[in-house]
Amino acid sequence: MIFSTLEHILTHISFSIVSIVITIHLITLLVDEIIKLYDSSEKGMIAIFLCITGLLVTRWIYSRHFPLSDLYESLIFLSWSLSVIHIVPYFKKKKKNLSTITASSVIFTQGFATSGLLTEIHQSAILVPALQSEWLIMHVSMMILSYAALLCGSLLSVALLVITFRKNRNIFCKRNPLLNELFSFGEIQYMNERNNVLRTTFFSAKNYYRSQLIQQLDYWSYRVISLGFIFLTIGILSGAVWANEAWGSYWNWDPKETWAFITWIVFAIYLHTRTNIKLRGANSAIVASIGFLIIWICYFGVNLLGIGLHSYGSFTLTSN
């Protein structure tokens, strides 16, 4: 009873902190100069991480099994994994300009998990026979860690595409017929030369910053996705061994397994494109962006179906 109450308290605290951090992030998007707000949001992310950790430990003790048996528990663990990816660069004092992407992932996932939409599966239950195995921690944790890393890496690639393909607004008009009537040829030539100098200086600084940001996004998306791909491979292989012990077959092509294989193929293609210098950058980022959608279909969309050998981790949306 005590652990159940503590879990309930931590759930509401984490949701409250998420709401506060969302507000702070919205303010920092409007006012970039307020450094104290940025520090407050980062401290809020650390508080969220501590709450999620306490929530997982409490549920583990209360349910007497590792909290990865259903969608709600896996969402909490996914939030924890995303928060780890977020706070590690923060403590190393690196890549603050990339923290907004990882922070948004944590806020969205934890906010959804604790918002009350999954109230029906919040209560802990006895594990079904298929999950009463030592492979539960190995397989499911590796899969969730891979989802977290691949989602963050894919979001970095999406940001890379947005910055790359965003068109520059031409703040200086190239031709103006009215100038030809009001000014002489020499005056027009002088004004054009001055505008060209200003425009060149402005866009040179802007393009330099943009190129540096694109390089950072490309660099970190590749490394985070590579880490996630390793986790995904380990998760699929451990799941195959577990499936052979439980069902007598390494692979059964149920919806979850099929989409996990599709996810693996997509990110294998991404890593393959990275070996070609000509395909790096925007081309490989497009593949990673496709992978972002595939991950959500594999992790969340398949659970809505409630069919297949992994149906015990699903849920159904019911109306009152």
From Swiss-Prot:
GO terms for molecular function: heme binding. Keywords: Chloroplast, Cytochrome c-type biogenesis, Membrane, Plastid, Thylakoid, Transmembrane, Transmembrane helix. It holds the Pfam family Cytochrom_C_asm. GO terms for biological process: cytochrome complex assembly. GO terms for cellular component: chloroplast thylakoid membrane; plasma membrane. The keyword Signal does not apply. InterPro entries: Cyt_c_assembly (IPR002541), Cyt_c_biogenesis_CcsA (IPR017562), Cyt_c_biogenesis_CcsA/CcmC (IPR045062). It is a multi-pass membrane protein. The chain crosses the membrane at residues 15-35, 43-63, 71-91, 98-118, 143-163, 224-244, 251-271, 285-305. It is found in: Plastid, Chloroplast thylakoid membrane. It comes from the Eukaryota. Required during biogenesis of c-type cytochromes (cytochrome c6 and cytochrome f) at the step of heme attachment. May interact with Ccs1. NCBIfam families: cytochr_II_ccsB. Belongs to the CcmF/CycK/Ccl1/NrfE/CcsA family. This is Cytochrome c biogenesis protein CcsA. The lineage of its organism: Eukaryota, Viridiplantae, Streptophyta, Embryophyta, Tracheophyta. The gene is ccsA.
